[in-house]
């Protein structure tokens, strides 16, 4: 799994309903948790 992500803040909403700081963080979380998380949309998830 890729674990080094930039700290640039370009938030994306994952298909799991969580907001990630950027797409790299989402991809890393999906890999580490062995789940299929995709980008639902760019920007924060609606709470």
From Swiss-Prot:
A Pfam short name: Kazal_1
Residue ranges annotated for the Kazal-like domain, each copy included: 1-47
Cysteine disulfide partners in this protein: 1-31, 5-24, 13-45
UniProt keyword list: Disulfide bond, Ion channel impairing toxin, Neurotoxin, Protease inhibitor, Secreted, Serine protease inhibitor, Toxin
UniProt-annotated location(s): Secreted
Gene Ontology terms: cellular component: extracellular region
Cross-referenced SMART domains: KAZAL (SM00280)
Known role: Acts as a neurotoxin by inhibiting an ion channel. May also act as a serine protease inhibitor, since it possess the kazal serine protease inhibitor signature.
Family: Belongs to the conopeptide P-like superfamily.
Protein's name in the database: Turripeptide Ici9.1
């Amino acid at each position: 799994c890729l674990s080094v992500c930039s700290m640039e803040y370009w938030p994306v909403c994952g298909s799991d309903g969580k907001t990630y700081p950027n797409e790299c963080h989402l991809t890393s979380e999906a890999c580490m948790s062995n789940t299929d998380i995709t980008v639902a949309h760019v920007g924060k998830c609606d709470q």
